[in-house]
């Protein structure tokens, strides 16, 4: 009986992995890439460029939408709590821009966008460090499996933000400095495929199994 049971479990896992690339998720990813293109084009319009606060607000809103959209692709939207999760993902993708004001020591938007160097949360080396630290903290606090997706949510929110910023500034990889700016279409491609990469990594680490139990169904993203 053990062999058929194990085979059934492995078959279910394989099906869950294949569902990561379902038709619905691929359409959602294509929509995410299209949104990036349209939103970035909108940001270049003169009435946006001539108002610093408006430009910063819209740019930050785009970061938030990309973050929540990406996480929605990962987990799917099946019940009310899923919407709370994607909103949190959008918030995390957006809130890191507050470090501009921290670095500027002022609420002046002009000072915040004209810093001598990049603020701390824009160091890409911090992403794996923060995600791993959060995972260790959750383990130390013995949090329930229902919280197991938090490090991955943080990963996709921060990474999507950094990749988008990388078009203009490259990635800041401490202690090695900045990379060359990321080409625009590479940024769009990475952003659209990042949810699927995240899903595969979650599958390989067993996180998707715990989330499927939490959601009560096999996740189809």
UniProtKB/Swiss-Prot annotation:
GO cellular component terms listed in the entry, alphabetical order: membrane
Transmembrane segments: 28-48, 57-77, 86-106, 121-141, 182-204
Predominant place of localization: membrane
Key words, A-Z: Membrane, Transmembrane, Transmembrane helix
InterPro entries in the cross-refs: TMEM267 (IPR026572)
Topology of this chain in the membrane: Multi-pass membrane protein
Subcellular location as annotated: Membrane
Top-rank taxon, per record: Eukaryota
Keyword Oxidoreductase: no
Record-given protein name: Transmembrane protein 267
């Amino acid at each position: 009986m053990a062999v058929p049971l194990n085979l059934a479990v492995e078959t279910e896992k394989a099906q869950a992995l294949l569902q990561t690339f379902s038709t619905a998720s691929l359409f959602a990813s294509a929509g995410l890439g299209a949104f990036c293109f349209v939103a970035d084009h909108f940001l270049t319009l003169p009435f946006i460029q001539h108002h610093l606060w408006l430009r910063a607000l819209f740019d930050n809103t785009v970061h938030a939408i990309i973050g929540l959209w990406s996480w929605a692709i990962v987990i799917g939207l099946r019940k009310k709590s899923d919407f709370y999760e994607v909103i949190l993902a959008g918030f995390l993708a957006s809130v890191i821009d507050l470090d501009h004001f921290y670095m500027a020591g002022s609420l002046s938007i002009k000072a915040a966008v004209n810093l001598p160097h990049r603020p701390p949360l824009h160091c890409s080396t911090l992403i794996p460090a923060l995600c791993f630290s959060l995972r260790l903290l959750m383990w130390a606090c013995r949090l329930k499996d229902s919280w197991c997706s938090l490090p991955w949510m943080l990963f996709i929110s921060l990474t999507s933000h950094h990749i988008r910023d990388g078009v203009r500034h490259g990635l800041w990889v401490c202690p090695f400095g900045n990379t060359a700016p990321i080409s625009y279409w590479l940024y769009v491609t990475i952003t659209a495929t990042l949810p699927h990469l995240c899903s595969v990594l979650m599958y390989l680490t067993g996180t998707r199994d715990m989330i499927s139990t939490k959601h009560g169904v096999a996740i189809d993203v």
